[in-house]
């Protein structure tokens, strides 16, 4: 961390950076600065624009407008190769190493001949205190050391600007401390680090400055020592939204009737000491007619839990009970037939067939139930019903899903899940990457679904979304749920965030 206020010219200045996707403004005139020898932490909720900004700086994505000043020169657009030449290196959350190659081969992979210096590599290893056996396979490294290999790859390219995307998401506290020791050694050489994270205690430990992004803008920026936790929490939290569907929309939304009806409050889904990839000993009950919020940080195990419930991942221990019957051994299709429906986090790669028609997508799960072949007239009528209920904007049923905006794609995905007649609907980040108007529509929709006594499990990293929508809330921390469900006044952004971040003051928030 910086120990002096005397700094040279900034390593990086991003000025008035704008970016739009499918008509949605993702970045709205961003200014961002990084100095030599400092860690500038970047926080924000999902969809705030952090990753987009960093991809622009790293040359992966072009900005629509704005400039990047690097080394005294202004650039409108970079490529990844050009960014590397300018000393910029992005270390992704999941290190992209070749496990079957040696550590040495991974570090030197892709370097220009003039950079292929074994002596330079050895000097960097010594400076950072790395005790690698360079001839060992990269696949034998733990996560923290894989992160360091990625960082070394950047330094071998003479990188002066390192962008670390959630570098501690998969690390234990001991691994995190080891990484921080090496980062501090690196800062002493004049390298600047952009540190993207959701973990406030770690940010306070390592960062000189903090910037908070919200809805494509910088909502807060300042020295770490001058910003309180409450300041940061308030900056992350978006504005409140409205709450209910119109009467006519509710009529159009009425779900298909071929599912068992449960009285509100009836336990529908029960998890007993569930253990799987990324989570352990998770127990909870989901009731008919409620929205149960599941909050937590990136890497807390929420998506892994959801995919295990749906049968996409292997269950290692515990029991899943649906309507009082164990479903551990059932396939995904069998769980779907029994009314367990999952809306995945990534609508484009996991949720929709982007090249298929809208009508086909909406009825895709019911095609699986009655045979693959579509019934065009019936499918078009089904799509029309959801268009009216969800205010989906499109030109014709035959158009491909990829032609819609992100918000309308998400509504098509929700319609697809609803047409499968869910008893339990698991929605993972349902408003990620959609604008405020579409978010409001989705919030209204989820309430109306719950009003039909569907049990809704809402997984979201948007804590205000959880506060606004959930009847009860569990917070996952490092793969576990170590508290009883939050209810009533305890469901607030401050309490949820303190539990999720592992903040030492979290108990005070519940008083």
Swiss-Prot record:
Membrane topology: Peripheral membrane protein
Name of the protein this chain belongs to: Autoinducer 2 import ATP-binding protein LsrA
Protein location: Cell inner membrane
Domain of life, per lineage: Bacteria
Pfam families listed in its UniProt record: ABC_tran
ABC transporter domain: residues covered: 12-240, 240-503
A molecular function GO annotation: ATP binding
SMART domains, alphabetized: AAA (SM00382)
Family: Belongs to the ABC transporter superfamily. AI-2 autoinducer porter (TC 3.A.1.2.8) family.
Name of the gene: lsrA
Assembly mode: The complex is composed of two ATP-binding proteins (LsrA), two transmembrane proteins (LsrC and LsrD) and a solute-binding protein (LsrB).
Alphabetized SUPFAM superfamilies for the sequence: P-loop containing nucleoside triphosphate hydrolases (SSF52540)
Keywords of this entry: ATP-binding, Cell inner membrane, Cell membrane, Membrane, Nucleotide-binding, Repeat, Translocase, Transport
Broad class of enzyme this protein falls into: translocase
InterPro entries the record matches: AAA+_ATPase (IPR003593), ABC_carbohydrate_import_ATPase (IPR050107), ABC_transporter-like_ATP-bd (IPR003439), ABC_transporter-like_CS (IPR017871), P-loop_NTPase (IPR027417)
PANTHER family per UniProt: AUTOINDUCER 2 IMPORT ATP-BINDING PROTEIN LSRA (PTHR43790:SF2), CARBOHYDRATE TRANSPORT ATP-BINDING PROTEIN MG119-RELATED (PTHR43790)
Major site of localization recorded for this protein: membrane
Reaction catalysed by this enzyme: ATP + H2O + (2R,4S)-2-methyl-2,3,3,4-tetrahydroxytetrahydrofuran-[AI-2-binding protein]Side 1 = ADP + phosphate + (2R,4S)-2-methyl-2,3,3,4-tetrahydroxytetrahydrofuranSide 2 + [AI-2-binding protein]Side 1
Binding site for ATP: 44-51
Chain's role: Part of the ABC transporter complex LsrABCD involved in autoinducer 2 (AI-2) import. Responsible for energy coupling to the transport system.
EC number(s) per entry: 7.6.2.13
Presence of keyword Transmembrane helix: no
UniProt xrefs under NCBIfam families: PRK15439.1
Species assigned in the record: Escherichia coli (strain SMS-3-5 / SECEC)
Record-level GO cellular component terms: plasma membrane
């Amino acid at each position: 961390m910086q120990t002096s206020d005397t700094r040279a010219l900034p390593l990086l200045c991003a000025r008035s950076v704008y970016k739009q996707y499918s008509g949605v403004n993702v970045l709205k005139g961003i200014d961002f600065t990084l100095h030599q020898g400092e860690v500038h932490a970047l926080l924000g909720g999902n969809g705030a624009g952090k990753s987009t900004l960093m991809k622009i700086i790293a040359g992966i994505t072009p900005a629509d407008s704005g400039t990047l000043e690097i080394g005294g020169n202004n650039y409108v657009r970079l490529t990844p190769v050009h960014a590397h030449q300018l000393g910029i290196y992005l270390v992704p959350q999941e290190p992209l190493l070749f496990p079957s190659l040696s550590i040495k081969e991974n570090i030197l992979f892709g370097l220009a001949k003039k950079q292929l210096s074994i002596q330079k590599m050895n000097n960097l290893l010594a400076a950072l205190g790395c005790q690698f056996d360079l001839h060992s396979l990269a696949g034998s490294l733990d996560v923290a050391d894989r992160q360091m290999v990625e960082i070394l790859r950047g330094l071998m390219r003479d990188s002066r600007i390192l962008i670390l995307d959630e570098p501690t998401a998969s690390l234990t506290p001991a691994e995190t401390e080891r990484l921080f020791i090496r980062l501090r050694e690196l800062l002493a050489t004049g390298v600047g680090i952009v540190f993207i994270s959701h973990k406030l205690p770690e940010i306070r430990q390592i960062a000189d400055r903090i910037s908070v992004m919200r809805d494509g803008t910088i909502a807060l920026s300042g020295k770490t020592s001058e910003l309180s936790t409450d300041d940061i929490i308030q900056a992350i939290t978006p504005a409140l939204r409205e709450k209910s569907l119109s009467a006519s929309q509710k009529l159009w939304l009425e779900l298909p009737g071929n599912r068992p009806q449960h009285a509100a409050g009836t336990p529908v889904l029960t998890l007993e000491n569930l253990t799987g990839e990324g989570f352990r000993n998770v127990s909870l009950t989901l009731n008919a007619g409620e929205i149960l919020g599941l909050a937590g940080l990136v890497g807390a195990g929420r998506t892994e839990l959801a995919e295990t419930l749906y049968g996409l991942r292997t269950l290692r221990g515990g029991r899943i009970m649906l309507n009082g019957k164990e479903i551990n051994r059932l396939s995904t299709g069998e769980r779907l037939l029994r009314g367990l429906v999952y809306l995945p986090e990534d609508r484009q790669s996991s949720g929709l067939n982007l090249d298929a028609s809208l009508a086909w997508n909406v009825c895709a799960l019911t095609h699986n139930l009655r045979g693959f072949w579509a019934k065009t007239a019936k499918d078009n009528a089904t799509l029309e019903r959801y268009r009216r209920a969800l205010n989906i904007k499109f030109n014709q049923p035959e158009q491909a899903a990829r032609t819609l905006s992100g918000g309308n794609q998400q509504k098509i995905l929700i319609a697809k899940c609803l047409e499968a007649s869910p008893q339990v609907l698991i929605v993972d980040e349902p408003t990620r990457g959609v604008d405020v108007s579409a978010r409001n529509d989705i919030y209204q929709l989820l309430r109306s679904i719950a009003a039909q006594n569907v049990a809704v499990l809402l997984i979201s990293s948007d804590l205000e979304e959880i506060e606004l929508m959930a009847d009860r809330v569990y917070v996952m921390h490092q793969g576990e749920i170590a508290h009883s469900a939050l209810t009533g006044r305890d469901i607030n952004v401050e309490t949820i965030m303190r539990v999720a971040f592992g903040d030492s003051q979290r108990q005070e928030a519940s008083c």
